[in-house]
Amino acid sequence: LEEHGDVDKVLSECKYTVEQTYHTKANQQTMMETFRTACYMDHFGRLVVLSSTQIPFHVRRIVGRALDIPASKVRVIKPRIGGGFGAKQTSVSEIYPAIVTWKTGRPSKMIFSRHESMICSSPRHEMEITVRAGADENGIIKAIDVYTLSNTGAYGEHSSTTVGLSGHKSIGLYRHTEAYRFAFDVVYTNVQAAGAYRGYGATQGIFAVESAVNELAHKMGMDPVKVKEMNMPI
């Protein structure tokens, strides 16, 4: 829970208020290039991992620990990749060819089909976000209250950071607030584990808060763009 000021009191004093719940889906990753990794041993005796990844240093650490070898024995090369959007912020295809090459000394590669990539990648976190907002007679937004319920799926990778950004990146857009509150819960469910996805939680939160501000502007009979111009930092 993060709170500044007395949200309930300020909202009760606002001339215009809105309360609405918004739902965002667990969109699937569909980067053009699927997960793929090639491995070989170099002339220094190092395991070279050539991978379509967004996290080369994490891959180096993970492969080293999986094989129980020092990180100095692993070199990760990250070429220009054909899209990642957050899906490749998880180690997916690197471990198996790394094991094969380290055990046999021979080159190896692993290329995922589109179907395999969709099974193994991490979709966006599904969220249910409740927003309360209030403004005075001049259209100045005085209070924002955001509660996010995030579905992380079967495992909690990126769960605490993405849900945090749903509030931190949305409430902060408005500079005249006298009070704000942000609270969240994350739940495990028996579905595909969610992870990093473009916007990283901010997308869901901003969609909800901006939708609430649009509805608030409609109540006030004002242009939503005008309301946002009046309330956002210059």
Annotate each language-model stretch with its function:
Residues L1-I234:
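Structural alpha/beta core scaffold segments of enzyme domains
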